[in-house]
């Protein structure tokens, strides 16, 4: 019968609550700065030793056009390869970096980031890494 059932929201009732439902949990893992820097240094060293890092003077994109960028990538023989373009986050190059971002955001295997966003994740995820000279100088400064 219906006697002594308690609340209609009890777990054993239809429409009742969940007994041990999911709880929000923080999965973040604290990694020390020195360890994080060491990991970045070793991942970058591995990419360099494999010959997957190219340093260019500049990514000169006058207009934010994907077609222009694809032609530029073809000159580097990067068809079908996951590519990472790293630029320096200077205030002088903000427009050109934004043009690079706009030109690459619709291409499946291409990512364009600033040096402050560079992480081991990006280095492992992408096959080829293309850096500007300024970006390389900034990375050397941080990792030295």
PLM feature spans:
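Glycine/serine-rich anion-binding loops at beta->alpha junctions
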Residues: 2-20
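Extended polybasic, low-complexity segments that bind anionic RNA or targeting/receptor surfaces
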Residues: 21-144
């Amino acid at each position: 019968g219906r006697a002594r059932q308690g609340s209609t929201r009890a777990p054993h009732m239809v429409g009742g609550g969940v007994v041990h439902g999911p709880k929000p949990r923080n999965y973040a893992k604290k990694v020390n700065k020195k360890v994080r820097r060491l990991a970045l240094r070793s991942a970058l060293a591995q990419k360099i030793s494999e010959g997957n890092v190219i340093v260019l003077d500049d990514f000169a994109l006058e207009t934010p056009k994907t077609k222009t960028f694809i032609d530029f990538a073809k000159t580097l023989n990067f068809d079908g390869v996951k590519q990472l373009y790293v630029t320096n986050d200077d205030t002088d190059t903000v427009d050109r970096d934004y043009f690079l971002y706009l030109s690459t955001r619709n291409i499946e295997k291409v990512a364009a980031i600033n040096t402050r966003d560079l992480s081991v994740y990006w280095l492992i995820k992408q096959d080829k890494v293309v850096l500007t000279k300024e970006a390389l100088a900034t990375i050397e400064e941080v990792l030295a």
